[in-house]
């Protein structure tokens, strides 16, 4: 039906007769001439109808936005004065000789000026996806997956599928359960990741595996989370953690070079402890130059409990954040930041405004200055590198609250004051995570997942001091987003059972949930390691959007609903009966 795409016509096509198929993006009726912008997935071209082709001109008068049409015409060069430098096809236009209206469009439920609520965009997603910027994002996503496949093939990885209907295993979120009609009362689980299957593939001798795969997690959603998402899943045998990172870093550098024309360079490597100490985050945005500075040792003897308490507590921390030029902040802005850190558990926000450092106490403005002598204040200014016109904010509490609150404040202030260089790319690896973290109920939970190997520890040493264990794990972070994470896996049965035991999984439960894995570990398991990238998040970064729903063709809302198809929906009672399922309604609160 077509000979060319609208968006691919150039000066080289001048004089050629072409047939185009697409949609009316815009129509302008000048009486004797009618112009339309005609759109397809490759872009937009200007088509015009003149009186010499009366039948086509008459039919063109009926055109409206989003009519689906076919046009045959001749490509012509535009006059110099009519060239549109903002369009890829702006040097040419098509003189139409014939027009076919394939399908008409009703009055559109979306505003052609693109001022639409996200709810409307999701409900009429098939119309939203016609917008050039949305089409371009999905084309970029397709390019990314193509580049990934070629890279992985070139590096000896095998694309192997793993099951969608599998067994529920604890991986940190709730499973989506699928009832079995054949096995009454039993359920499959949709995979949160192919974790165990890819490890089993290494035990099967496939050495290098990858898969671009759907995963499912029934968890509370955030702006960058979806109940179903896509991973670039990778596993290798006989490779160390640095070797895995080297190959995966090469993949990501390849993507940025091909998609953005940007060489990311070598990725710095930072430990979890250093990231938390300097940036208050295990996924630091290195485009932001500000860092946290520990000052607890300077404040242990002050008669100000807000500082002295955490400063003398082994589990406490007092950290300072120097904000270049921050002395210009108003009282209202400072109060807003004080309220902001309370979201993260902080009780408030102390500060020092540095107006003229050389004047000592007279050169600063601070509500806490009365609790600090000139010597302590000068030591704080010296350590933080404060200059005239700067602001210093303080966080004082337990280590987690200080890291969370001051880390978030660092990001917010950096954005608000334009200190974060948003023209840059700042990738890094974060390594050496704690193996376990407190579950809040006196027990431990795996910081990554229970199949991650500890670093330089025997099973006996791990059992004796699990709180000291460092995971042989690594995350890739770009511009403050965790885009991928992985680890060296446990390849020894004793170690795996030790980890299960530390997590409170008794032997009976181990056999019930992981018997197949424990059995497989008995038969010459190779050392193996892997990683998974979030394809949605990678695409989000590479297309410059901050909304993950913009890079998924048919995403869910934050309530895990599809507004277009109205999923989820109630099941047919007959289907439920066949599955031996009865829906029990919760009693309404009186």
UniProtKB/Swiss-Prot annotation:
Name of the protein in its database record: Aspartate--tRNA ligase
Listed GO MF terms: aspartate-tRNA ligase activity; ATP binding; nucleic acid binding
Binding site for ATP: 217-219, 226, 482, 534-537
Localization: Cytoplasm
Keyword set includes Hydrolase: no
Major localisation: cytoplasm
Function: Catalyzes the attachment of L-aspartate to tRNA(Asp) in a two-step reaction: L-aspartate is first activated by ATP to form Asp-AMP and then transferred to the acceptor end of tRNA(Asp).
Substrates-to-products reaction catalysed: tRNA(Asp) + L-aspartate + ATP = L-aspartyl-tRNA(Asp) + AMP + diphosphate
GO biological process: aspartyl-tRNA aminoacylation
The entry's keywords: Aminoacyl-tRNA synthetase, ATP-binding, Cytoplasm, Ligase, Nucleotide-binding, Protein biosynthesis
InterPro entries registered for this protein in UniProt: Aa-tRNA-synt_II (IPR004364), aa-tRNA-synth_II (IPR006195), aa-tRNA-synth_II/BPL/LPL (IPR045864), Asp-tRNA-ligase_1 (IPR004524), Asp-tRNA-ligase_1_N (IPR047089), Asp/Asn-tRNA-synth_IIb (IPR002312), AspRS_core (IPR047090), GAD-like_sf (IPR004115)
NCBIfam families listed in its UniProt record: aspS_bact, PRK00476.1
Pfam families on file: GAD (PF02938), tRNA-synt_2 (PF00152), tRNA_anti-codon (PF01336)
Aspartate: annotated span: 195-198
Magnesium keyword on record: no
Chain ranges passing through the membrane: none
GO cellular component: cytoplasm
Alphabetized Gene3D superfamilies for the sequence: Bira Bifunctional Protein, Domain 2, GAD-like domain, Nucleic acid-binding proteins
Family: Belongs to the class-II aminoacyl-tRNA synthetase family. Type 1 subfamily.
Binding annotation for L-aspartate: 171, 217, 448, 489
EC numbers for this chain: 6.1.1.12
């Amino acid at each position: 039906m077509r000979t060319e795409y609208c968006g691919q016509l150039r000066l080289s096509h001048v004089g050629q007769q072409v047939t185009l198929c697409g949609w009316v993006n815009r129509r302008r009726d000048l009486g004797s001439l009618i112009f339309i912008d005609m759109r397809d997935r490759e872009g937009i071209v200007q088509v015009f109808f003149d009186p010499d082709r009366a039948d086509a001109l008459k039919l063109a008068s009926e055109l409206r936005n989003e009519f689906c049409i076919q046009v045959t015409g001749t490509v012509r060069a535009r006059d110099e004065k009519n060239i549109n430098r903002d369009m890829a096809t702006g040097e040419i236009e098509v003189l139409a000789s014939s027009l076919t209206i394939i399908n008409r469009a009703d009055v559109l439920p979306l505003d052609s000026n693109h001022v639409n609520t996200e709810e409307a965009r999701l409900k009429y997603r098939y119309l939203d996806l016609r917008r050039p910027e949305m089409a371009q994002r999905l084309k970029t996503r397709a390019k990314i997956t193509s580049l990934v496949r070629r890279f992985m093939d070139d590096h000896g990885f095998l694309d192997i599928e793993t099951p969608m209907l599998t067994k529920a295993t604890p991986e940190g979120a709730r499973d989506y359960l699928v009832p079995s009609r054949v096995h009454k009362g039993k359920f499959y689980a949709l995979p949160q990741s192919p974790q165990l299957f890819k490890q089993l593939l290494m035990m099967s001798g496939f050495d290098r595996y990858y898969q671009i795969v759907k995963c499912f997690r029934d968890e509370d959603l955030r702006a960058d989370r979806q109940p179903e998402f896509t991973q670039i899943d990778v596993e290798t045998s006989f490779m160390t953690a640095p070797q895995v990172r080297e190959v995966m870093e090469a993949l990501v550098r390849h993507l940025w070079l091909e998609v953005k024309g940007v060489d990311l360079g070598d990725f710095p490597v930072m430990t979890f402890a250093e990231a938390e100490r300097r940036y208050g985050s295990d996924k630091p945005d290195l485009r932001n130059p500000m860092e946290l500075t520990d000052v607890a040792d300077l404040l242990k003897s002050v008669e100000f409990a807000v500082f002295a308490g955490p400063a003398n507590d082994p589990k406490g921390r007092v950290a300072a954040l120097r904000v270049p030029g921050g002395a210009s902040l108003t009282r209202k802005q400072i109060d807003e930041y004080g309220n902001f850190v309370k979201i993260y558990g902080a009780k408030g926000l102390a500060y020092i405004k540095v107006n003229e450092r050389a004047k000592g106490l007279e050169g600063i403005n601070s509500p806490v200055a009365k609790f600090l002598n000139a010597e302590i204040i000068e030591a704080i200014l010296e350590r933080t590198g404060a200059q005239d016109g700067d602001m210093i904010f303080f966080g004082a509490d337990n280590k987690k609250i200080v890291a969370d609150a001051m880390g978030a404040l660092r990001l917010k202030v950096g954005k608000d004051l334009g200190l974060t260089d948003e023209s840059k790319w700042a990738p890094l690896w974060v390594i050496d995570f704690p193996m376990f973290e407190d579950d809040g109920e006196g027990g431990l939970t795996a910081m990554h997942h229970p199949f991650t190997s500890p670093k330089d520890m025997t099973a006996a040493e791990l059992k004796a001091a699990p709180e000291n264990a460092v995971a042989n794990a690594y995350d890739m972070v770009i511009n403050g987003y965790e885009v991928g994470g992985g680890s060296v896996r446990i390849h020894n049965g004793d170690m795996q059972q030790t980890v299960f035991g530390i997590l409170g999984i008794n032997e009976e439960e181990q056999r019930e949930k992981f018997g197949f894995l424990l059995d497989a570990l008995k038969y010459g398991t190779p050392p193996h390691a892997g990683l998974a990238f979030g394809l949605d998040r990678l695409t989000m970064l590479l297309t410059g959007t901050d909304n993950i729903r913009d890079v998924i063709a048919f995403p869910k809302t934050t309530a895990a609903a599809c507004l277009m198809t109205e999923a989820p929906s109630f099941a047919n009672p007959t289907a439920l009966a066949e599955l031996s399922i009865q829906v029990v309604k919760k009693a309404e609160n009186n």
